[in-house]
Curated annotation (Swiss-Prot):
Keywords: Cell membrane, Disulfide bond, Glycoprotein, Ion channel, Ion transport, Ligand-gated ion channel, Membrane, Receptor, Signal, Synapse, Transmembrane, Transmembrane helix, Transport. Pfam families: Neur_chan_LBD, Neur_chan_memb. The gene is Chrnb3. It comes from Mus musculus. Glycans are attached at N55, N172. It comes from the Eukaryota. One of its GO terms (biological process) is presynaptic modulation of chemical synaptic transmission. GO terms for cellular component: acetylcholine-gated channel complex; cation channel complex; dopaminergic synapse; neurotransmitter receptor complex; postsynaptic membrane; presynapse. Disulfide bonds join C159-C173. Activated by a myriad of ligands such as acetylcholine, cytisine, nicotine, choline and epibatidine. This is Neuronal acetylcholine receptor subunit beta-3. It is found in: Synaptic cell membrane; Cell membrane. Residues 31-238 are extracellular. CDD domains: LGIC_TM_nAChR.
Length: 464
């Protein structure tokens, strides 16, 4: 008896499962049949090239919105903005309405967009020839005739770049959408939301979106009005990369130029250092030229700074040549030092510049050299005439010795004078180096501050 019950229960379970499966299959088959019948009903005689209105005077209201998923690139050189967006579009198609009760309670269906009438909304400022979104997506059609279509699109839109404050710049790029063929009496655009949807936005490493809003407008041509929607994107560059790899090296090069005047003038590396800095700045200028657009309207901030430093370095080379020339002057090169130069560069300026003259200067009073003979070296004694040959020989010998001493003294004084002139000119060169060191350091700091502070203040103000 127990075995019979087990067989009976197993058979009952099998029959119940089969019945459920058959019921579900029948249900699915019924839904598919209803949807198939609905599609045949809706698209029988449907012309996608004809506006789906009851009266020719009716206006199709297209509710339009934009959702941005990625800011791919901002190309300053070619003045392009590349974005990945979704175009939200919704309108009512009077030819696609049905009673859900007649088709198994179906309230909405998915229809390929290429089978429907579309309001042909395109991007006007397109730069790569692709004006429309992707047609490979399906639209949702509701029983009330409402059509919702959200195709993805990748756009390259034209954008006029203002690189005045590069790399602390802000750009305002716009995307203008409108119907390509229908005027305002046939299709009207209505904004779903004035703010661009950024819920699924993927951040860009170089730019951030400060603001993105839409605004409706109308363009009139004769008797016709063409509605459009313009989305404005306010973009701010993140300047960390350019600050670390462009601005800071340029600042370092400018201060290297200042250190040229700290090198001794008798070293041959002063001109080599200045020339190397000038070549490095030229390379940086070529790098910037590859980034920014070629325009004669504005000079970018970093370009102004590089131009300032290049002029700065060029002047330092000219000044260095002059200082080296002063350093190697002497009386033998027919450059006697004027009295005012001595007073200014050897007495006054060193005190103002906190410089000390390390040389010990010796002065020889005029007229200290005796022009008399040996006989004149004995004051208070009466001049006597040698009485013997021995005395006459001794006096002649002493006079020759005195003449030799005077000759040696004159030669030593001349050598000392020449050496003193050489040392004086070298000290003048040191004073000039110290003057230009402070002048160029002050000019470098003030120039950097005056060029970058306004841009930094503007960038920080926009950040807050």
């Amino acid at each position: 008896m127990t075995g019979f019950l087990r067989v009976f229960l197993a058979l009952s379970a099998t029959l119940s499962g089969s019945w459920v499966t058959l019921t579900a299959t029948a249900g699915l088959s019924s839904v598919a049949e209803h949807e198939d019948a609905l599609l045949r009903h809706l698209f029988q005689g449907y012309q996608k090239c004809v506006r789906p209105v009851l009266n020719s005077s009716d206006i199709i209201k297209v509710y339009f919105g934009l959702k941005i998923s990625q800011l791919v690139d901002v190309d300053e050189k070619n003045q392009l903005m590349t974005t990945n967006v979704w175009l939200k579009q919704e309108w009512t198609d009077q030819k696609l309405r049905w009673n859900p009760e007649d088709y198994g309670g179906i309230n909405s269906i998915k229809v390929p967009s290429e089978s429907l009438w579309l309001p042909d909304i395109v991007l006007f400022e397109n730069a790569d020839g692709r004006f429309e979104g992707s047609l490979m997506t399906k639209a949702i059609v509701k029983s009330s005739g409402t059509v919702s279509w959200t195709p993805p699109a990748s756009y390259k839109s034209s954008c006029t770049m203002d690189v005045t404050f590069f790399p602390f710049d802000k750009q305002n790029c716009s995307m203008k959408f409108g119907s390509w063929t229908y005027d305002g009496t046939m299709v009207d655009l209505i904004l779903i939301n004035e703010n661009v949807d950024r819920k699924d936005f993927f951040d860009n490493g170089e730019w951030e979106i400060l603001n993105a809003k839409g605004m409706k407008g109308n363009r009139r041509e004769g008797f016709y009005s063409y509605p459009f929607v313009t989305y404005s994107f306010v973009l701010r560059r993140l300047p960390l990369f350019y600050t670390l790899f462009l601005i800071i090296p340029c600042l370092g090069l400018s201060f290297l130029t200042v250190l040229v005047f700290y090198l001794p003038s008798d070293e041959g590396e002063k001109l080599s250092l200045s020339t190397s800095v000038l070549v490095s700045l030229t390379v940086f200028l070529l790098v910037i030229e590859e980034i920014i657009p070629s325009s004669s309207k504005v000079i970018p901030l970093i370009g102004e700074y590089l131009l300032f430093i290049m002029i700065f370095v060029t002047l330092s080379i000219i000044v260095t040549v002059f200082v080296i020339n002063v350093h190697h002057r002497s009386s033998s090169t027919y450059h006697p030092m004027a009295p005012w130069v001595k007073r200014l560069f050897l007495e006054k300026l060193p005190r103002w510049l906190c410089m000390k003259d390390p040389r010990d200067r010796f002065s020889f009073p005029d007229g200290t050299e005796s022009k008399g003979t040996v006989r004149g070296k004995f004051p208070g004694k009466k001049k006597q005439t040698p009485t013997s040959d021995g005395e006459r020989v001794l006096v002649a010998f002493l006079e020759k010795a005195s003449e030799s001493i005077r000759y040696i003294s004159r030669h030593v004084k001349k050598e000392h004078f020449i050496s003193q002139v050489v040392q004086d000119w070298k000290f003048v060169a040191q004073v000039l180096d110290r003057i230009f060191l402070w002048l160029f350091l002050t000019a470098s700091v003030l120039g950097s501050v005056l060029i970058f502070i306004p841009a930094l203040k503007m960038w920080i103000h926009r950040f807050h």
